[in-house]
């Protein structure tokens, strides 16, 4: 699942809302793929649906937040035209789960 967002940060209140949203999606297991684009694996559609419900409860009042669910195969087929995979992506690799 990909979470992409563009949130205003002009006022102190908007900055707090941005930081809180970012912190909350990271608590949901999302890792930063690139600036304002976060990714997380979902082994089943029912899990994606429950994550979507939780994300809907924490979105700030202003801005733009989008979610999209894609398969692992589609994610693996993503082409990187410039740059490289993030450190978090390298650590995760193609594994669905990280055992700590």
Where are these regions (language model features)?
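Basic nucleic-acid-binding interfaces
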Residues: 1-2, 8-100
């Amino acid at each position: 699942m990909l979470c992409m967002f563009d949130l205003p940060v002009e006022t102190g209140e908007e900055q707090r809302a941005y930081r809180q949203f970012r912190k909350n999606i990271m608590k949901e297991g999302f890792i930063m793929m690139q600036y304002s684009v976060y990714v997380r694996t979902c082994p089943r559609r029912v899990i994606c649906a429950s994550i979507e419900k939780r994300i809907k409860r924490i979105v700030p009042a202003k801005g733009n937040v989008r979610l999209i669910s894609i398969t692992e195969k589609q994610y693996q087929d993503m082409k990187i035209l410039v740059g490289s995979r993030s450190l978090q992506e390298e650590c995760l690799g193609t594994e669905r789960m990280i055992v700590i």
